[in-house]
Amino acid sequence: MVKKNFIPSVSLVRRDLPTLVTTTTSSTALSKPTSSVVSETSSKSLPSLTSSAFSTSSGATSSSSLIVASITPPSTAGNPFILNAADKPNGTVYIAVGAVIGAIFISILIWWLVSSYLSRRFTMTNSYANDSKNLYRGHHKHSSSLQSNPFDINDEKSYMQDDWDSMSQLESSQYEDAASPFNPIQDPFTDNRRSLFISPTLQVSQYEKSHSRHQSKDTNIFIDDPFLYVGTYLEEEEEEEEERKLNLNRPQRAASPERKEKKINSMEGYHKRNQSSLGLIPVASATSNTSSPKKAHKRQAPSMFLDDVLNGREII
């Protein structure tokens, strides 16, 4: 038995396409949207799709009204509590604040300018004074350009004092040998010293003599200047007062000879109070009498002194 390929038979049935049906509805009142409605129609058992749309021809309108009140400021006429700003420009407060700040800045600027000018003037006058002092030292007549300055008299006095100091140093350097300027007491024989003995009194006297000699020469040179003469006179008076205080010119004895007399007088008064005759004896005889028994009496050993006490020879 031979098998054959079996081919099934298929019957094709023709189907029609679905039909689309559209319907429109209109209404005069408020319309609400309607959803599309799908209806099934049977046409040879095929579904059909139906859609509907809506359209509005008119709608309802509503109206509303809002009432707003108008605000009017009070009148300034006759009201003392309201500033009448009709006469004032706009921004009066800002203008006033700016004017105050500007006045403060202007005052600070003026103060800075004045202070800088005064300081510069002061430095210029000082520098001019120093230059004139260095250039015209030794001359007592300076230029008259500073006569308007109220400190001219003091400046002249200071110049005179400086000139006096410089000239005195020059004179002292002429008469003095090589000496240290830091030590006022100088010994001219320091290099040739052979002994180690130093006499402060001799050094002070030598210094006073040299100082008085130089001072007399300086006063003879500058005797025509009254200011310098008065200054030297005052310096001499101060030195004399210092010498009186120190008493360097008068030699003092180491021991006063009056001490023995005072001692004798005190001893006499003491013996008179005690009613003894020792005060009538001269001091030399009294000392000799008191020292003689000490010399005659020999020093004994402690054991011998104890034996004498026990034997009754000595009384404690």
From Swiss-Prot:
UniProt record similarity statement: Belongs to the PRM5 family.
Main location: membrane
Lipid bilayer topology: Single-pass membrane protein
Keywords from the named record: Membrane, Phosphoprotein, Transmembrane, Transmembrane helix, Vacuole
Subcellular location: Vacuole membrane
Annotated region (Disordered), positions in chain: 32-60, 240-304
Protein's UniProt name: Vacuolar membrane protein YNL058C
Positions of post-translational Phosphoserine modification: S148, S256, S276
